[in-house]
Amino acid sequence: MSKKGSRSSGRAVLTSAILLAATVGNAAAPLTLTGWDRRAVETARRGALKRLESEECRKVFIDFTDAQGRTLQQNLEKRTASPAEYIGLVPFVDGSSQALCRETKTALVATPGVRRVFVCRTFAEVQLRQPGLAESLVIHEILHTLGLGENPPTSIEITQRVQARCR
């Protein structure tokens, strides 16, 4: 092969690698929130942070445990110094691809132990009509990201506990 052919071949490989990396990178990137969904999450997150300034509200982190029996406060301490710092690290992303978001009236979805919350299309309406509930749901999902499973406790029980502690 000539030098010119080798250079062209090298450029083609490099171009293909760049395109593949860009495609893979975009496919793996979480869907960012836009418009009202983003504003609804920002507003509810700010409200949740204000509620968590209360010592009584922060007790929700010791009210629940993960599957290994550790309190969520212990899991929080492993990750960061405060609930406010941790909530700032948790991405809230578009949940339109999630079955629970498509098939139910669920507002937010999180997997126990995974630091990510999916935002369903109903969340913005909840935040608009019942801002206190939206703030409680943010805290509820943060508990899941720290390892809290469900059933038991039920989703309703978790939200009720958050509402009782975080008035």
Predicted features, each with a name:
Residues 2, 25-135, 145-167:
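Predominantly extracellular/secreted Zn2+-dependent metalloproteases
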Residues 15-22:
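Bacterial N-terminal signal peptides
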Residues 138:
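Substrate/cofactor-recognition hotspot
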Residues 141:
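Walker B catalytic acidic pair
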